[in-house]
Amino acid sequence: GVGLARIEFVLTAQVGIHPLALAFYDQLTDFSRHGFVAPSLKPYEERLRSEDPHELATLLGAVERRTPGYTDQRAFFVDQLKFGVGLICAAFHPRPVLVRLSDLKSNEYRDLLGGRLFEPVEENPMIAWRGASRYADPGFRQAFAMECEALRFVYQEMGLDNLQLMIPFCRTPEEGRAVVEVLTREGLGPSQGIPLFLQKATDRPGQELRGMPGVGIGEEEKGTVRLLKTLMAGPGLS
């Protein structure tokens, strides 16, 4: 099987566009043309209004060129991800393929096309808004919903039941529990038959979540470098 397939490789190599720039493409286009800020873009209004209009139009044109044949740019993200993950799962079926959910750092998301509109500038992205902390966050909900849609297609529509999932960079039991709840709502939880693993960033989550009925964390893995950086609050981008 595959010990660890990382979704971020598909995001950077095959997609290359910030997921929210795709999810909100139509709303961004309306803003660029008419100055109208849709409710979904309200959290980003200050950044949008500080953006040079010509640069924003150029950015949206680049997104359109990267998604030829798509009238719904959101579907481009889902297609790239489901075919990328599906290809790996199909190649190794029935052997298990462990897929780690997206774990780009904020500076890496900013490097994607449109990323500067949606990502904060963080002093230490290595231990900041990443991994599990994003998935249940309202500011990333639309992006993670697309990720889940693609993975659900792989498991349900493609019938690749060797798919397994890993939650990366989980810092607290509450964080892990919230992510499990989101995955379950999206049809990707342990109750739907998908093995779920935990990559913890501190010593707390695995021990406490493992003993909770219904949470369904199957296994845990320490990211040793990340654990050290988190505990020491050490700087670093890699």
Spell out what each predicted region is.
Residues 1-238:
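Conserved alpha/beta-domain cores
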